[in-house]
């Protein structure tokens, strides 16, 4: 039965009903709707709408319904109820009779759904937090195993300077730290309860909304009823958090796709996260990573769509806001799945250390070291930069590495170059010199690993 209808003389067209109904997706708010209803029933005692005995009967029935929902949430979809609020009320009435009709006193679906969604977001954030932590842990463990794995670092997808695979892993740890911080910031802002704001002007019953907020686990009650029922900032923030983090995961996936390619050959992915070709028997495709990369656009589309939905809405509630849930549910599900999949991919990775080292020696990745060497000898950096560029050109012509050039050849470009130049051209020297905080030196990488392990509670 609909929660409205007395004012209407005609039955809703079935096509409109299907268009209007939201149970097919907002059924995911069932537990939160029941939780909010229990708290609301307690508040109704304080204003004399319910007796203690009546409230206890309602709470008992609601808890029974909660157990049924937790056992089989999909069963809700067998109903033709308009939305989750209608379904919960209908189920409650079937359990306690007319008493169930008193529960909605002083409450609107507007403040009800706003509360439900915030409760759902709070719970889902805990799942996202755990997944972000677990991916960081796998990255740190992988970094610790590969501190000595030298590989080329890239700019413009060209070999630039030598780094380690550990340093690469730790770069993504930093991105995930920011993702987690944004998520916690969002949680702080959404942790206010709209329940008791009614349709838009507040409830006519003198309910202690701060007490109500406390019962539901919120930090406080919202301050303005008009804003409270129409606020979807937390939806936008979570979609923004998801979009930014998915960009990080997409870049992670792209890096590994390249590292796994025949052209790079730095890693091999586990059979558990790859697939084959229906035509080419030799293929081993990085499907898990490609799907992470592909799903990034879907999440960002949800953010853009929600922004466009909200941008022109007058205060307060409008049915447009029903569109907040499908995109949010889908985007956060994708984000969570991709966090789990990224950890699974990394957990089974095989790093080809010799191939990484071989690639690091190519592409004149030690050219910057030669420029710094000249600076240390008193040559201005801009002049040193030009000199080394000329040396690289000669080395390219001869098909030699910088460290393979005879000293006499190097001295043609600068008399500042002497025998000790070869000490600084080794890959290890390139790494060791990056001693400043955040650099790729083994000491700094080890320090970063130790700090990350402490923060993530890794033994």
Curated annotation (Swiss-Prot):
InterPro entries in UniProt: Arg_succ_lyase_C, Argininosuccinate_lyase, Fumarase/histidase_N, Fumarate_lyase_CS, Fumarate_lyase_fam, Fumarate_lyase_N, L-Aspartase-like
Annotated disulfide bonds: none
Superkingdom, natural source: Bacteria
GO MF annotation terms: argininosuccinate lyase activity
Localisation per UniProt entry: Cytoplasm
Pathway where it operates: Amino-acid biosynthesis; L-arginine biosynthesis; L-arginine from L-ornithine and carbamoyl phosphate: step 3/3
Key words of the record: Amino-acid biosynthesis, Arginine biosynthesis, Cytoplasm, Lyase
Family: Belongs to the lyase 1 family. Argininosuccinate lyase subfamily.
Name the UniProt record assigns to this protein: Argininosuccinate lyase
Source organism phylogeny: Bacteria, Pseudomonadati, Pseudomonadota, Gammaproteobacteria, Enterobacterales
